[in-house]
C-alpha cells in the first residue's frame, strides 16, 4: 500500500499552480496545501489554500502541524534568501529548496559573480561597487556597452540595459542614489553587455548530482517584438530549438547526448551546472532544490561546437513562466524527484521527459508592469477543463464575495499547450487564451515566433543543401525587383523638370544645368537617411510618407547653400522586396521631389536577405542642386542680423532612438497605436510619422527677394548645434526662449524623459525646422514672402558680437 503524503507549496503564482498540478499526479500525494495561494484551489480537488500574512518558518511550521505536512516545496526566491529552509529544518520539516547560504547565488549578484570567477564558470567581465562616485568614475572610463544589476533581490526587475553613456549614468543613479530597487541597490554589479539568444536552463539537484531540464526561452518585455518595459515574463516555450539539437518534433538523438537535449546542453552541464553544484558544496553551501541558469548563447557561429555560452545570472528556484512549460513535459513523478533531492539519492532516479513542445502565453492586467486594477471578473475560466495538453495556470487571481474568480495581480493567467510540434503548441496556446477574457487583458502575440523562424531557416538550409541553387533561392527575387521598377516608373516621370535628359533605369542619370537655366553654377550635394523613424513606420505598416522625410533631409540641406535642388536619387535596401511596400515608399519619395521642384532620376533597390530581416528596410538619399557662383550662401552675416524661425511639422527625422526609448519604456504601457495623450484625434504613431517639412520652395522665394544672408537646417543637435554651423567666427546667436511655439509632442517627450530645456534644445528641433539669417531692413518683406508660401514665421533672435574674441567659434546664447 502506497503511503500518501501531504506537501505544502509556498507561493501564489502560475509557477506554484503548475507545481501543485504536477504534484497531484503522484500516487504518493494526498493533498497539497497552497500558501498563500490563489483562486486555483477552487478549480482543483485535494488542494487547500491557506492565507498567511507573513511567510516565515514559524508561520509555515504551524500550518504544517495543522494539516499534517511533512514536506515543503518553496516556489519564490525571497523566502529562500531569507532562510526559511534553515528555519523549517530546525523544526524537523523536510524542505525542497536551498539554504540561506546556498540561496546567495540569487540573493547577492556580487556573491554570484565572485563565485563564478572563483570556479571558472563563463560569465561577462564585471566590477562591483558600494560607492556611487567610484562606480560613476568606472562607468565613465569604459568604452563598451554595459549592464547594471542591483545586487539584491528586486523581483526580477533590478537589471538595467542602457543604450549609451548618458543612460548608463542615469541608471546608476536610479539604482544607488534614488533607490528605485530599495536596499537591493546598496551594492551594484557593472558587467559587460553580451549579445545573442537568452536561454533558461534549470536542473534538479541533491547537492551532489543533478538532472537537467529541457531548456526554455522566456519573453521578458511587455510588448511584441521585445519592446516596452521588462516584466516577470510574458510567455515561454520549451525546448528551445536554437540550443537543442532537434527539429520541429522536438526529437533528439539521445544516443549521442548524455543530457538527452544535445551537445550544447551537454556542454552547459559540464562547464556550468556541474561546476556550480560542486563549487557550492566545496564552499560549505550544498545546493538542494532547483538551480536556474540564465544563459546567453552567442550567435557568432552557426556550428554547434563554436557557440559561446555565458551565464547571465543564477536563480535559486524554478523560473516563472519557464516552470509552466517545463513541468508539462516531465514524465517522471515530481514528488519522487523532490524526495530524491531531499534524501540525497537523485543519481538513482531515471528522470524522463516528453519529446513534445510546450508553450505558455501570459494574460496580464492592463497597465502591467506598472500600476493595474484588481477585482475584475475573469470570464471563461471555469468553462475550461484542464487536460494534460491544455492547461490554464492561475497567478494573480482570487475569489470575491460573489464567488467569482477575479484578477488580483499583474500577471493573471498562463495559458499552456503541449503538442507534437512547436507550431501547433503555439497555435493551441493562443486558441486557449482566446477563450478567456477580463477587462483590459493584454498578452503578447509573438510568443515562440523566434523559434519558428529558427526552425524555418534550418528547414530551408536542409532543403537547399539537397538541390541545385538559383539566385531566387538565395532570397533575391529579380522579378519582384522588376515589378517595383515598373510601378515607380510613372511616379518618377511625374517629377521630370527642365534639365532632365535621361529616363529611369539606365546605368547613369544625366542632367543638363544649362537647359535648367544656370549660367555659372556651383553644384551642391546633400545625402542623408531617415534613421530609426523607419522602425516605427515598419511596425505600424505606414510606408507612404517616410519617403518625404528622406527627400526633405537632403534637399533642406542643399537649400541652406542657396541652391535649387535639381535631381534626387534614392537607395532602398531590404531583406525581401514586398512590391506594395517598396512602391509606397518610392511614391513618398516622388511626392517629396515634386513638392521641392527636383526630379527623381535614379536609384537602387537592393534585396539582401542576409543583411536585413523580412519586413525590414533602410533608406538613403542623394540630392544635387545648383547655385550661381555669385549667389552662394551664407554671405555677409553680421551683427544685428535677425533670426527668423520657420515652424517644424513635428519631430522631423532626428532623435528617434531617444523617442522610441521614451515611448517604449517610460510611457506607462502606451504603444504607437495608442491615442496621443496630447491630441485625441491622432495616435502616437501618426504624430511621430508626420513627415519632415519641406522648406525648399518657400526659402528659394525668400532668397530670390533679397536680404537672406544665411540659413540653418535644424536637425540632430537642435538649434544649439546646427545654427552656429553657418555663423562666422567672432559672432554669436542670441535666441529668445519663448519666442516660438514648442509643439505638444516635444512637451510630452520632455515630461517622459524629465528633460531639461537645455537638453531639449540640443537634441530635437523643438518646433523650429529652419532658421533664416536676415538683414534687419528686409525682415518684413521676407516674412510676408514666407507666409505667402504657408510658412509659420517666428522672430526668435539676432546675431551679436562675441564677448570673447573675434576668433572664437560661434555659439548659441539663450535668453
Curated annotation (Swiss-Prot):
SS bond list: none
Q: Could you say which EC number(s) this protein's record lists?
A: 6.3.4.13, 6.3.3.1
Keywords on this record?
Answer: ATP-binding, Cytoplasm, Ligase, Magnesium, Manganese, Metal-binding, Multifunctional enzyme, Nucleotide-binding, Purine biosynthesis
Q: Any idea where this protein resides?
A: Cytoplasm, Cytosol
ATP-grasp domain segment(s) = 113-343
One Gene Ontology cellular component term attached to this UniProt record is:
cytosol
**Binding-site positions, ATP:** 139-200
Chain segments carrying region AIRS: 469-801
Task: Output one GO MF annotation.
Answer: phosphoribosylformylglycinamidine cyclo-ligase activity
Which coenzyme or cofactor does it need? Answer: Mg(2+); Mn(2+)
Residues annotated for Mg(2+) binding in this entry: 313, 315
According to its UniProt record, which reaction does this protein catalyse?
5-phospho-beta-D-ribosylamine + glycine + ATP = N(1)-(5-phospho-beta-D-ribosyl)glycinamide + ADP + phosphate + H(+); 2-formamido-N(1)-(5-O-phospho-beta-D-ribosyl)acetamidine + ATP = 5-amino-1-(5-phospho-beta-D-ribosyl)imidazole + ADP + phosphate + H(+)
GO BP annotations, alphabetical order? 'de novo' IMP biosynthetic process; adenine biosynthetic process; purine nucleotide biosynthetic process
Pathway(s) per entry: Purine metabolism; IMP biosynthesis via de novo pathway; 5-amino-1-(5-phospho-D-ribosyl)imidazole from N(2)-formyl-N(1)-(5-phospho-D-ribosyl)glycinamide: step 2/2; Purine metabolism; IMP biosynthesis via de novo pathway; N(1)-(5-phospho-D-ribosyl)glycinamide from 5-phospho-alpha-D-ribose 1-diphosphate: step 2/2
Cofactor notes: Binds no magnesium or manganese ion per subunit.
SMART domains noted in UniProt: GARS_A, GARS_C
Main localization is: cytoplasm
Stretches for region GARS: 6-452
Q: Could you say which protein family the record assigns here?
A: In the N-terminal section; belongs to the GARS family.
Q: What does this protein do?
A: Catalyzes the second and fifth step in the 'de novo' purine biosynthesis pathway; contains phosphoribosylamine--glycine ligase (GARS) and phosphoribosylformylglycinamidine cyclo-ligase (AIRS) activities.
- Protein known as: Bifunctional purine biosynthetic protein purD
Q: What is the lineage of its organism?
A: Eukaryota, Amoebozoa, Evosea, Eumycetozoa, Dictyostelia
Gene that encodes the chain: purD
Amino acid at each position: 500500500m502506497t503511503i500518501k503524503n501531504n506537501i505544502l507549496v509556498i507561493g501564489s503564482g502560475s509557477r506554484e499552480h503548475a507545481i501543485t498540478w504536477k504534484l497531484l499526479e503522484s500516487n504518493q500525494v494526498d493533498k497539497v496545501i497552497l500558501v498563500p495561494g490563489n483562486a486555483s484551489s477552487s478549480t482543483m480537488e485535494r488542494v487547500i489554500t491557506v492565507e498567511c500574512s507573513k511567510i516565515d518558518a514559524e508561520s509555515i511550521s504551524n500550518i504544517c502541524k495543522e494539516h499534517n505536512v511533512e514536506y515543503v516545496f518553496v516556489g519564490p526566491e525571497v523566502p529562500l534568501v531569507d532562510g526559511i529552509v534553515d528555519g523549517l529544518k530546525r523544526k524537523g520539516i523536510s524542505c525542497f529548496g536551498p539554504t540561506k547560504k546556498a540561496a546567495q547565488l540569487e540573493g547577492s549578484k556580487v556573491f554570484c559573480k565572485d563565485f563564478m570567477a572563483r570556479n571558472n564558470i563563463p560569465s561577462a567581465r564585471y566590477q562591483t561597487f558600494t560607492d556611487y562616485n567610484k562606480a560613476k568614475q568606472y562607468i565613465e572610463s569604459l568604452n563598451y556597452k554595459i549592464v547594471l544589476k542591483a545586487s539584491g533581490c528586486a523581483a526580477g526587475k533590478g537589471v538595467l540595459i542602457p543604450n549609451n553613456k548618458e543612460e548608463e549614468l542615469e541608471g546608476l543613479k536610479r539604482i544607488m542614489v534614488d533607490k528605485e530597487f530599495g536596499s537591493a541597490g546598496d551594492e551594484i554589479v557593472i558587467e559587460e553587455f553580451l549579445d545573442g539568444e537568452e536561454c533558461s536552463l534549470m536542473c534538479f539537484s541533491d547537492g551532489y548530482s543533478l538532472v537537467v531540464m529541457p531548456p526554455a526561452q522566456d519573453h521578458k518585455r511587455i510588448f511584441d517584438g521585445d519592446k516596452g518595459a521588462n516584466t516577470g515574463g510574458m510567455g515561454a516555450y520549451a525546448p528551445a530549438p536554437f540550443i537543442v539539437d532537434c527539429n520541429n518534433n522536438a526529437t533528439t538523438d539521445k544516443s549521442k547526448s548524455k543530457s538527452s537535449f544535445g551537445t550544447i546542453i551537454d556542454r552547459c552541464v559540464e562547464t556550468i551546472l556541474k561546476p556550480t553544484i560542486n563549487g557550492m558544496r566545496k564552499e560549505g553551501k550544498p545546493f538542494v532544490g532547483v538551480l536556474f541558469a540564465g544563459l546567453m548563447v552567442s550567435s557568432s557561429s552557426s556550428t554547434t561546437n563554436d557557440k559561446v555560452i555565458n551565464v547571465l545570472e543564477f536563480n535559486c528556484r524554478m523560473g516563472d513562466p519557464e516552470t509552466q512549460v517545463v513541468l508539462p513535459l516531465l514524465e517522471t513523478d515530481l514528488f519522487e524527484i523532490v524526495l530524491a533531492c531531499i534524501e540525497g539519492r537523485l543519481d538513482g532516479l531515471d528522470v524522463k521527459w516528453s519529446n513534445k513542445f510546450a508553450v505558455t502565453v501570459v494574460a496580464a492586467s492592463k497597465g502591467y508592469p506598472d500600476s493595474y486594477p484588481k477585482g475584475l471578473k475573469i470570464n471563461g475560466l471555469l468553462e475550461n477543463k484542464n487536460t494534460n495538453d491544455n492547461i490554464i495556470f492561475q497567478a494573480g487571481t482570487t475569489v470575491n464575495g460573489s464567488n467569482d474568480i477575479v484578477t488580483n495581480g499583474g500577471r493573471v493567467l498562463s495559458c499552456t499547450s503541449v503538442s507534437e510540434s512547436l507550431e501547433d503548441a503555439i497555435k493551441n496556446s493562443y486558441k486557449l487564451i482566446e477563450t478567456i477574457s477580463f477587462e483590459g487583458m493584454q498578452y503578447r502575440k509573438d510568443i515562440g515566433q523566434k523559434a519558428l523562424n529558427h526552425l524555418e531557416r534550418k528547414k530551408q538550409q536542409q532543403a537547399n543543401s539537397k538541390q541545385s541553387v538559383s539566385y531566387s533561392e538565395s532570397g533575391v527575387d529579380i522579378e519582384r525587383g522588376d515589378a517595383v521598377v515598373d510601378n515607380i516608373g510613372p511616379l518618377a516621370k511625374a517629377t521630370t523638370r527642365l534639365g532632365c535628359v535621361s529616363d529611369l533605369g539606365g546605368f547613369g542619370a544625366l542632367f543638363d544645368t544649362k537647359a535648367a537655366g544656370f549660367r555659372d553654377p556651383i553644384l551642391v550635394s546633400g545625402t542623408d537617411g531617415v534613421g530609426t523613424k523607419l522602425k516605427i513606420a515598419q511596425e505600424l505598416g505606414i510606408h507612404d510618407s517616410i519617403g518625404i522625410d528622406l527627400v526633405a533631409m537632403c534637399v533642406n540641406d542643399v537649400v541652406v547653400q542657396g541652391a535649387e535642388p535639381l535631381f534626387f536619387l534614392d537607395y532602398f535596401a531590404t531583406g525581401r522586396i514586398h512590391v506594395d511596400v517598396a512602391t509606397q515608399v518610392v511614391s513618398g519619395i516622388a511626392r517629396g521631389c515634386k513638392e521641392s521642384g527636383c526630379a527623381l532620376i535614379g536609384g537602387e533597390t537592393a534585396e539582401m536577405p542576409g543583411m536585413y530581416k523580412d519586413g525590414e528596410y533602410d533608406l538613403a538619399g542623394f540630392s544635387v542642386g545648383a547655385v550661381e557662383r555669385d549667389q552662394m550662401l551664407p554671405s555677409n552675416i553680421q551683427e544685428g542680423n535677425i533670426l527668423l524661425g520657420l515652424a517644424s511639422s513635428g519631430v522631423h527625422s532626428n532623435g528617434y532612438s531617444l523617442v522610441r526609448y521614451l515611448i517604449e519604456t517610460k510611457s506607462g504601457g502606451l504603444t504607437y497605436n495608442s491615442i496621443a495623450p496630447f491630441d485625441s484625434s491622432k495616435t502616437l504613431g501618426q504624430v511621430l510619422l508626420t513627415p519632415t517639412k519641406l522648406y525648399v520652395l518657400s526659402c528659394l522665394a525668400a532668397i530670390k527677394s533679397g536680404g537672406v544672408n544665411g540659413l540653418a537646417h535644424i536637425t540632430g543637435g537642435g538649434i544649439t548645434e546646427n545654427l552656429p554651423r553657418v555663423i562666422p567666427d567672432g559672432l554669436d546667436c542670441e535666441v529668445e526662449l519663448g519666442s516660438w511655439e514648442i509643439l505638444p509632442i516635444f512637451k510630452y517627450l520632455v515630461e517622459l524623459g524629465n528633460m531639461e530645456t537645455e537638453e531639449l534644445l540640443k537634441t530635437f528641433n523643438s518646433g523650429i525646422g529652419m532658421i533664416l539669417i536676415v538683414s534687419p531692413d528686409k525682415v518684413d518683406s521676407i516674412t510676408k514672402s514666407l507666409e505667402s508660401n504657408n510658412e509659420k514665421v517666428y522672430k526668435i533672435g539676432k546675431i551679436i558680437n562675441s564677448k570673447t574674441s573675434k576668433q572664437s567659434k560661434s555659439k548659441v546664447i539663450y535668453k
